[in-house]
Amino acid sequence: MLLAALCCLLWSFRTSAGHFPRACASSKSLMEKECCPAWTGDSSPCGQLSGRGACQDITLSKAPLGPQYPFTGMDDREAWPSVFYNRTCQCFGNFMGFNCGNCKFGFWGPNCTEKRLLVRRNIFDLSVPEKNKFLAYLTLAKHTISPDYVIPIGTYGQMNNGSTPMFNDINVYDLFVWMHYYVSRDTLLGGSEIWKDIDFAHEAPGFLPWHRLFLLLWEQEIQKLTGDENFTIPYWDWRDAKSCDICTDEYMGGHNPANPNLLSPASFFSSWQIICTRLEEYNSRQALCDGTPRGPLLRNPGHDKARTPRLPSSADVEFCLSLTQYESDSMDKAANFSFRNTLEGFASPLTGIADASQSSMHNALHIYMNGTMSQVQGSANDPIFLLHHAFVDSIFEQWLRRHHPLQEVYPEANAPIGHNRESYMVPFIPLYRNGDFFISSRDLGYDYSNLQDSERDIFQDYIKPFLEQASRIWPWLIGAAVVGSVLTAVLGRLTSLLCRRKRKQLREERQPLLMEKEDYHSLLYQTHV
């Protein structure tokens, strides 16, 4: 009933998220390589007449890249987004968006001057109505076509360098599934040749900033779709879990009794269709995923013990947080003692040494789900993806608060393609740099309930010894206060008496030795009888 009501009531809400704006998918925009749509508020490109932004040339980073990708000019994602556009909206102040029609993260209001902090909460701390609303929002997004964005179904070359646009509509939820596919897909080299050692969002420094932006845009999209400006993505704290405790019909879907690889018919998500999962087919055809439905969600948690013998523990997380280096060595999945590589799951959470034979931390959850979520390109089809990555982001945030790194700690050069600090993140339009999200979540308008609680605990632990010491000397303090009060009263009385005596002496000393002139003459001319 809740879902039906939401669908009927909110179907007309317009949305905006990330990737190819519908307004920039024409042959004119592609051939002119310009994406500067008009803002509806004043009908000028980028809201320029209202001072919101301007259409400007894109300045690309010239920092050298790592050796992992040896080609140039073979992939549309290289030097993003220059293959498609070299001019986009550059927004001013707190404005943001492909036409500068939105506010930067953390700002609200018609002029983006109101600053607010939203809090992401543990999904198990949500009330039943809150949890049901979250599930309904997910399903609404799955059934609402994005009015503002489309997905390309061919490369720029296959579009005849923009003269023959190839784009499809897509629903709001699947837009983000497609983006996660596109950022991590293989490079199509022509014929039947591909290059697999490439990923613009994983296995390198940009893993955490990219997924941070992905969640922020997804969150913003749901806020606009539903009109619920207070919506935040809940997180799943999987530390020390013995099983998938959110894999129930009450939450993210239980087992189908007839087929353990499918979801229960009673689940919100049992009827969902997945996209972008046939990678070998796309590669063999040298084609992109076109958003065609490919069957139901698959999930059978905990049945690949060889690669994932257990879920991550609290000790594993604490070891990650203790690592002082964000990135190290080759800055890829072979990096040792790297916080990013250990949290991502390519290095052991016991030693910090890269280990290709095991999947730990973030990777462990994907493998543990044993289904759609276990394949990188299609993993965002499973809504557990959002809850999982929200918790991964909270660990990233905890590391930032513990170590207080300068932005310069994020690698400026020699990272794998797409991962340098000043590189624009694929496939987002408007444009965002990796380094822009190597900052505290509070500067982006959100926090985590578990981090707020832990900070209060840290403060209480800090002052606890002082409070205990104060409790031991409390009787003495009371006695001292009483004695002090008596002494203060006595001293005050003595001081008052001394002051009065002093004032009397001063009055006598201040009497004039000679009379005033008038009094003197009056006395002088007095007659005597």
UniProtKB/Swiss-Prot annotation:
Lumenal side: 19-472
Mutation effect (residue 227 to W): May be associated with siamese coat color
Keyword annotations of the record: Copper, Glycoprotein, Melanin biosynthesis, Membrane, Metal-binding, Monooxygenase, Oxidoreductase, Signal, Transmembrane, Transmembrane helix
Reaction equations catalysed: 2 L-dopa + O2 = 2 L-dopaquinone + 2 H2O; L-tyrosine + O2 = L-dopaquinone + H2O; 2 5,6-dihydroxyindole-2-carboxylate + O2 = 2 indole-5,6-quinone-2-carboxylate + 2 H2O
Residue sites binding Cu cation A per the record: 180, 202, 211
Single Gene Ontology MF annotation: tyrosinase activity
Reported impact of residue 302 to R: May be associated with burmese coat color
Processing and modification events after translation: Glycosylated.
Enzyme class: oxidoreductase
Pfam families xrefs: Tyrosinase
Protein's cellular compartments: Melanosome membrane; Melanosome
This enzyme's EC code(s): 1.14.18.1
Signal peptide residues on this chain, from the entry's feature table: 1-18
Known role: This is a copper-containing oxidase that functions in the formation of pigments such as melanins and other polyphenolic compounds. Catalyzes the initial and rate limiting step in the cascade of reactions leading to melanin production from tyrosine. In addition to hydroxylating tyrosine to DOPA (3,4-dihydroxyphenylalanine), also catalyzes the oxidation of DOPA to DOPA-quinone, and possibly the oxidation of DHI (5,6-dihydroxyindole) to indole-5,6 quinone.
The name this protein goes by in its record: Tyrosinase
